[in-house]
């Protein structure tokens, strides 16, 4: 049985890849960033990638899909920004509601940052839930941690899953994996030691924990950094910064803290090594930093399919 999905704000394909692994076939993926669109086409030439503003996309012709998914922009709700919420012009939740009305999917899955669960956005969350309820969906909000699903990174993300009433009772959130994910040291040791860098073993010991959260930052400074400014970080000492530069040339006697390459950051985000990224280094790092870890999308996607099959 084939399950179809339409994805908005597809980015570099983290969510799309996870949903594909779960069993969804994408009828279309809408993304406004040219380099991210090229990344999608590079990895899946057969995907119907539509480059453009989702606000100009019309859902007619895609009615009857099984899933409407997307990672709508996070700046309106991110603590790194002004948290303007619904007053931010980048808020695309209204577009997701519009497309749900136009395409009438059986299920909806939208992803955003943890900040959306802040008390200041409670009324807006209720508004979103109510708007989908008017279309015949019962929605749930849930905070998930990527580390619970095999990713070597905490990365808390908010998921909104809504299903048509006939499927609602069959949906259950995915259970965390029983095994702990690899530490960053274990995950990246082969890449760190591939040039016979003598400090690789010591680096592995220092990196013997999972990562906090990879964050996309503005160009010309750092593009990815460890988000250790959170008051709950307890002053962890291993603050690493990834700068926009070439792939690190680690001399055998190098003793400093090496920068993380594009491939390393992608692996931390849960992408497979054969997933390629298009563009210069700044766009590539940004694509990775903004991505939804594929293993998390896969875990939720599998549960949605079970609900659509009425298996749970």
UniProtKB/Swiss-Prot annotation:
Its EC number is 2.1.1.37. GO terms for biological process: DNA restriction-modification system; methylation; negative regulation of gene expression via chromosomal CpG island methylation. It is an enzyme of class 2 (transferase). GO terms for molecular function: DNA (cytosine-5-)-methyltransferase activity; DNA binding. Signal peptide: none annotated. The keyword Transferase applies. Keywords: DNA-binding, Methyltransferase, Restriction system, S-adenosyl-L-methionine, Transferase. PANTHER family: CYTOSINE-SPECIFIC METHYLTRANSFERASE, DNA (CYTOSINE-5)-METHYLTRANSFERASE 1. Belongs to the class I-like SAM-binding methyltransferase superfamily. C5-methyltransferase family. This is Type II methyltransferase M.NgoMIV.
């Amino acid at each position: 049985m084939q399950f179809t999905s339409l994805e908005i704000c597809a980015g570099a394909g983290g969510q799309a890849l996870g949903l594909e692994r779960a069993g969804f076939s994408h009828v279309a993926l809408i993304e406004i960033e040219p380099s991210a669109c090229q990344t999608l086409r590079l990895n899946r030439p057969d995907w119907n990638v539509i480059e453009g503003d989702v606000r100009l996309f019309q859902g007619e012709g895609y009615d009857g899909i099984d899933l409407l998914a997307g990672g709508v922009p996070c700046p309106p709700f991110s603590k790194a920004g002004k948290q303007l919420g619904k007053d931010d012009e980048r808020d695309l939740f209204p577009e997701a509601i519009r497309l749900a009305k136009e395409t009438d999917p059986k299920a909806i899955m939208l992803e955003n940052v943890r900040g959306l669960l802040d008390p200041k956005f409670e009324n807006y969350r209720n508004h979103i839930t109510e708007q989908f309820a008017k279309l015949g969906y019962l929605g749930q909000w849930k905070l998930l941690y990527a580390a619970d699903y095999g990713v070597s990174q905490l990365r808390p993300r908010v998921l909104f899953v809504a299903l048509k009433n006939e499927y609602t009772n069959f949906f259950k959130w995915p259970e965390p994996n029983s095994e702990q994910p690899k530490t960053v040291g274990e995950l990246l040791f082969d890449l760190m030691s591939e040039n016979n860098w003598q400090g690789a073993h010591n680096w592995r010991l220092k990196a013997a924990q999972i990562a906090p959260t990879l964050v996309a930052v503005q160009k010309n400074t750092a593009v990815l950094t460890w988000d250790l400014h959170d008051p709950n970080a307890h002053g962890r000492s291993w603050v690493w910064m990834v700068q926009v530069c070439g792939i690190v040339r680690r001399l055998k006697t190098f003793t400093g803290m090496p920068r993380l390459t594009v491939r390393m950051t992608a692996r931390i985000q849960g992408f497979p090594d054969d997933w390629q990224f298009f563009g210069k280094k700044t766009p590539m790092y940004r694509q990775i930093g903004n991505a939804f870890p594929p293993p998390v999308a896969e875990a939720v996607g599998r549960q949605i399919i079970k609900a659509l099959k009425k298996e749970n």
